[in-house]
Amino acid sequence: MDRWGRTHEALRHAGWTLFAERGYDATSTAEIAERAGVSEMTLFRHFPTKERVLLADQFDPSMAAAVRARPADEHAMRAVAEGIRQSWSQMSAEDVESTRDRLRIIAEARTLRGGIERNNEETVAALERALVARGAGHPQARVAATAVVAGLSTALLDWARSDETTLHAALQSALDTLGGV
């Protein structure tokens, strides 16, 4: 990993750790930068806002690639659901635990509601582009991507708030419903 990547990961780790310890609202960008051993200006070169430290989604590219690889004749809703299922099934146990921790922080921080919506817009756009690349029309692609992301967001936040199920079970249930299984 190059210097930029190491700094980016150090900032993400520092932010997630502080958010878990103190809560999102009680953590400042200066504290994140200090914990990572960099200046606050460096933090803002990597993440334009504090919410991006928590909400920046590293899964969008792999989900979009999996959707693009789905059969061209597959319905858009099923293609998105199955592409996401395939992408997320490759998560390590460490990534699953980190995702649950991150989602718990998001679920508890009321000030992040608008940030979640903005972040979801980026995910919807990535999935919409993948569907269009497979041959779907723009309106169909937008509706399918938006529906799946909204449903998946609800399922993931519910999963994060409870200890009753595994990520795999929560995803399977949500994606089965969304994909029409």
State the predicted function of each range.
Residues M1-W4, L103, L175-D176:
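N-terminal intrinsically disordered/low-complexity leader segments
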Residues F19, S28-T29, K50-A56, M77-V80, ...:
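Amphipathic alpha-helical segments enriched in hydrophobic/aromatic and basic residues
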Residues A145-E164, G180-V181:
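Amphipathic C-terminal alpha-helical segment
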Residues A64-D101:
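Hydrophobic alpha-helical connector segments
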Residues R129-V132, E164-V181:
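C-terminal peripheral helix-coil segments that are non-catalytic and often amphipathic
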Residues M1-R22, A26-M41, L55, S62:
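Basic, helix-initiating cap at the start of DNA-binding domains
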Residues A109-R134, R142-T146:
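Amphipathic alpha-helical packing segments from all-alpha helical-bundle domains
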